Design a protein with these regions (language model features):
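A short, N-terminal "cap"/entry segment at the start of jelly-roll beta-barrel domains
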Residues: 1-40
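Ubiquitin-like/PB1-type beta-grasp interaction modules and other compact soluble beta-rich domains
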Residues: 2-3, 54, 73-76
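Short, ordered coil/turn segments that flank beta-strands lining enzyme active or ligand-binding pockets
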Residues: 10, 61, 70
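Conserved short histidine dyad/triad with adjacent acidic residue
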Residues: 21-24, 34-52, 87-90, 112
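Short beta-strand segments in beta-sandwich/barrel cores
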Residues: 25, 46-47, 64-68, 82
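Short, conserved beta-strand element in jelly-roll/cupin
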Residues: 40-41, 50-67, 107-109
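Short acidic-glycine-tyrosine-enriched beta hairpin
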Residues: 70-88
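A short hydrophobic beta-strand segment most commonly corresponding to one strand
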Residues: 84-88, 94, 98-112
Length: 112
């Protein structure tokens, strides 16, 4: 399982950090959630700079996403990848559905 944390750094920019579940046992325990929503994005669909609206898991079920960060880097994630979105402030990030398939995600807002 691959989990990537998307968070706001002290520089006000969003950053990515790979989380190893073996080193983060809290990821392997039951976490309270508010529900689940399924979303679909057609290939090429782009969302300009934005923040995560709340702490949430975003799991790509189908297709691929490209996440853009303030340092100019682009990162691609495909089916089965889990993002823990925690960049609630600062510059935020961009997202684009890439590849030939639509992107289908399951978003699980966390209860804090």
């Amino acid at each position: 399982m691959s989990i990537t944390r998307l968070y706001t750094g002290s520089d006000g920019r969003s950053h990515l950090e790979d989380l190893d579940p073996a080193a983060h046992p809290e990821l392997l325990t039951l976490q309270a959630a508010k529900g689940i929503v399924f979303r679909s994005a057609e290939p090429g669909q782009f969302h300009d700079w934005h923040h995560a609206p709340r702490r949430q898991y975003v799991i790509t079920l189908e297709g691929e996403v490209e996440i853009g960060l303030g340092d100019g880097t682009l990162h691609r994630f495909g089916p089965g990848h889990v993002i823990l979105a925690e960049d609630l402030s600062g510059q935020g990030h961009t997202t684009r559905a890439v590849g030939a398939k639509r992107r289908l995600t399951a978003t699980i807002p966390l209860a804090d």
